[in-house]
Amino acid sequence: MKTFTATPETVTRDWFVVDADGKTLGRIATEIAIRLRGKHKPEYTPHVDTGDYIIVVNAEKVTVTGNKAKGKTYYSHSGFPGGIKQISFEKLQAQKPEMIIEKAVKGMLPKGPLGRAMFRKLKVYAGAEHNHTAQQPQVLDI
């Protein structure tokens, strides 16, 4: 019997919507990363993007455990000397709550062109509304 290998033409992608209200950041991010890669499918192939589209709503209501709300720090660098910036979880949640889930999921995806293609299938919204109703997403309970 020949081993099955998925090709981009044979991959079928579904749309799922995930509600992050009251969910723990790491636990929801790992499940999203698995679904974006397509590892939940029997036709998973490591070198082909077999994952689904994921819409995350209520990103502003995601939680972290322990003292991470105050102690967790996100860093970015401009590329210039002395250009490092840091922001705490609490401030980032108030300013750009979508970025918290995006950074957590992006770190769990492969680095390179395939990982960037997988990351493009993630749509994160701070509130409960999203503009992907035409795709008829299914509710994914995590």
UniProtKB/Swiss-Prot annotation:
The keyword Ribosomal protein applies. Keywords: Ribonucleoprotein, Ribosomal protein. GO terms for molecular function: mRNA binding; structural constituent of ribosome. The keyword NAD does not apply. One of its GO terms (biological process) is translation. HAMAP family: Ribosomal_uL13. Belongs to the universal ribosomal protein uL13 family. This is Large ribosomal subunit protein uL13. It comes from Shewanella baltica (strain OS185). The lineage of its organism: Bacteria, Pseudomonadati, Pseudomonadota, Gammaproteobacteria, Alteromonadales.
